[in-house]
Regions:
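Bacterial Sec-dependent N-terminal signal peptides
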Residues: 1-23
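Phosphate-group recognition and catalysis centered on beta-loop-alpha active-site segments
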Residues: 19-299
Length: 299
């Protein structure tokens, strides 16, 4: 009996060490300076094979070897943070209205829909449930969730996952600092910069002067010389580039569907890699991982 107990304890310790190493490895690739590895970020989890932003979709991403899963937050009537992208629950759940119109128990009584709009057995997850599932396995990118920055931070603190999370916002440094300065340096914060908007370069300069973020999410509908100049500016600053391949208007036309439907991965993901991107957010995580592995840019 003692041998069995010791064996079980050893297995648990090994699993814990592997989990800790997994997150440490992803963080090193995100925050360090010397890795060739490119991180794969799956947008709204594995929504092609499970309901978007669902625990099952996140499990699928973990099993694939995805590095980071993107989620969005809303708050329930009774103050719980849940994972939901849209303003309403109409498209993705069996109910109607806004998440804040319902208590968590009421939302849990509903079911998530799949990509075809059919009811599934899956429930809307809370942020706490997501972080506990992801703990030691995959990092989390909170995209539409800045309005709940402080509350999200409290959940990360409670679950021991502050080091697992990236929080983003498309806002200038001064506002982010004024609203969340007390916790800003305790998390990985990533600015989102639309390179076409007036003042984009000033936003970059201000962040570089005051914060020096580990990475920037850059959005650009064209790949003209001015966009490429700003991309180089961020890359040459030492920050990592986070580029979306979700649809053409986010990446100058070098999107997932170009890679998959037009069979032009080198003109899509390859082009993004050539700009120096170290994080690619995708709707095709399995295929992007396959592409990167062939280039020895991912395990």
């Amino acid at each position: 009996m003692k041998r069995i107990y010791n064996f079980i304890l050893l297995v648990c310790l090994v699993q814990l060490a592997v989990a800790q190493n997994r997150i440490a490895e992803i963080r090193e690739n995100l925050l360090g300076n010397y890795s060739d590895r490119v991180l794969v970020v799956s947008h709204r989890a594995d929504w092609r094979n499970a309901p978007e932003n669902s625990l099952q979709g996140i499990r699928n991403c973990i099993d694939m070897g995805v590095d980071m899963v993107e989620i969005d937050l809303k708050k329930t009537k009774d103050g719980h943070l849940v994972v939901m992208h849209d303003k309403t629950i109409n498209r993705t759940m069996t109910g109607k209205g806004n998440a804040e119109d319902y208590t968590l128990a009421e939302l849990k009584a509903m079911r998530l829909k799949n990509g075809a709009g059919c009811k599934t057995r899956h429930q809307i997850p809370t942020l706490e449930e997501v972080m506990l599932l992801c703990k030691g396995k995959i990092m989390v990118n909170i995209d539409k969730g800045y309005d709940y920055f402080q509350e999200a931070y409290a959940v990360l603190e409670k679950t021991g996952t502050i080091d697992h999370c990236v929080i983003k916002a498309g806002l200038p440094y001064e506002r982010v600092k004024a609203e969340n300065g007390d916790v800003l340096d305790k998390v990985i914060f990533m600015p989102i910069v639309n390179l076409h908007k007036e003042g984009a370069e000033k936003i970059i300069n201000d962040y570089q002067s005051h914060m020096k973020p580990a990475a920037y999410e850059l959005v650009f509908k064209d790949d003209n010389e001015e966009m490429l100049r700003l991309i180089r500016k961020v890359r040459d600053s030492g920050a990592k580039l986070f580029i979306n391949s979700l649809w053409p208007e986010l990446c100058g036309g070098h999107d997932d569907d170009r890679a998959v439907e037009l069979h032009q991965p080198d003109e899509s993901w390859g082009w993004i890699l050539n700009q120096g991107a170290k994080l690619i957010q995708t709707h095709r995580p399995a295929l992007l991982l396959e592409y990167l592995r062939k280039k020895k840019l991912h395990d």
